[in-house]
Amino acid sequence: IQIPTLCYDPYLSITGACRMCMVETDNNGLVTACSTPVTDGMNIQTHSEKVEERRKEILDLLVSDHDIECMTCEADGNCALQDLAYEYGLDESSYKKESASDRIFDFYKDNEFIELDPNKCILCGKCIRVDQEVQCSDAIDFIERGFQTKVGTTFDEGLDSERSTCVFCGQCVEMCPTGALTYIPSKNKGRSKDFRTEVTTCPYCGVGCQLELRIKDDEIVEVGSVYRDNTPNPAGEACVKGRFGLEFVSHPDRLKKPMIKKEGELKEVDWE
């Protein structure tokens, strides 16, 4: 049974923030499936008319607070919000943004790895939870209040500020369901539909983290997470080297064959 969700992940704590997993029960009416324990005798309807109407209304509200720039968005084709909008036939929100000009946030572009666009954020909190619960960096959290609430850093100073504890692991980008968080090095180099993927072991240290290489034209464009039990990084953990340090693979100076010095010069030889 497919139940839509935007804030749930099996490796994170449950918040029920997006409300998209709403289901109908006999005793309690509409409840969030992720945060409601199953009990004996419970009768649950996952796709009743009432449930579908409420989900579409919730999605309408989420879209009203999201900049729809799918044609130029890096997450186009790999966006959970976009997928649900397509599924529910929602091409634009029926709600008008109140004081929209007062809620245009500045981008975080203070580093060379991660871009944060709060204008696309739906406040699901997945990036915050993976940062605090899996990576344990406590680099980002909800800041401001009410209509001005957004995801940000300490004193809203940016990810690379002196007081920031961000280690640029990229976990927040991997968790983001909307394209509010994207990788800067791979910008304008391709989208998910353009990539072929290969799972490999990170070459940097002896931990053996599993990484997903996203490849286009035989070059590594970006490195994603692998969520697999019985691995050193089951929740997709990675360090800045593993996430952003594999450009050397395609570097023209990379040695691809063994070399031996003959007469004062290095010359390529066979592996045998």
Question: What role is predicted for each listed range?
Answer:
Residues E24-N27, M42-H66, T72-E272:
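N-terminal export/assembly segments and adjacent metallocofactor-ligating motifs
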Residues I1-D40, K50:
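N-terminal cofactor/phosphate-binding cores enriched in small/glycine residues
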